[in-house]
Amino acid sequence: MPFVELETNLPASRIPAGLENRLCAATATILDKPEDRVSVTIRPGMTLLMNKSTEPCAHLLISSIGVVGTAEQNRSHSSSFFKFLTEELSLDQDRIIIRFFPLEPWQIGKKGTVMTFL
């Protein structure tokens, strides 16, 4: 159950229509998870400073069980997500940061319990 959060200082008017659906599909492919399990949040218009600059930038936060826990996994994921984001948002790679957060099943609540018991 991946959670993907895109935070950017780009205004909402510069976010391509349907980005949430394409980011969901890309995440499912990249992380090899079912698309109906991916949760996407996009936060445009944020106040962000990166590398001492307020030029357009983005932070991508990816949390998931079992697929973002090693450097080898995340190197591959990072390459794919960077390709997606640079194309979709027209940002250079040095204006994007990705943070990976491995989760345990007991850290996600669903259907009145936690994933451990589902």
Curated annotation (Swiss-Prot):
Subcellular location(s) of the protein: Cytoplasm
Q: In which tissues is it expressed?
A: In all organs tested, highest levels in liver.
Protein's UniProt name: D-dopachrome decarboxylase
Q: Tell me the gene name.
A: Ddt
Q: Which Gene Ontology terms describe the biological processes this protein takes part in?
A: melanin biosynthetic process; negative regulation of macrophage chemotaxis; positive regulation of ERK1 and ERK2 cascade; positive regulation of inflammatory response; positive regulation of tumor necrosis factor production
Provide this UniProt record's keywords sorted from A to Z: Acetylation, Cytoplasm, Lyase, Melanin biosynthesis, Phosphoprotein
Record has Disulfide bond as a keyword? no
Q: Which reaction does it catalyse?
A: D-dopachrome + H(+) = 5,6-dihydroxyindole + CO2
Q: Which organism is it from?
A: Rattus norvegicus (Rat)
Question: Residue positions of the PTM N-acetylproline?
Answer: P2
What EC number(s) are associated with this protein in UniProt? 4.1.1.84
Q: Which residues carry this modification: N6-acetyllysine?
A: K33
Q: Which InterPro entries match?
A: Macrophage_inhib_fac, Macrophage_inhib_fac_CS, Tautomerase/MIF_sf
Q: Does the keyword Cell membrane apply?
A: no
Report how activity changes across the pH range: Optimum pH is 6-9.
One MF term from GO for this chain?
phenylpyruvate tautomerase activity
Family the UniProt entry places it in: Belongs to the MIF family.
- A Pfam family annotated for this UniProt entry: MIF
GO cellular component, as recorded: cytoplasm; extracellular space
Q: Which Gene3D superfamilies match?
A: Macrophage Migration Inhibitory Factor (3.30.429.10)
Q: Where is the signal peptide?
A: none
The record's subunit annotation is: Homotrimer.
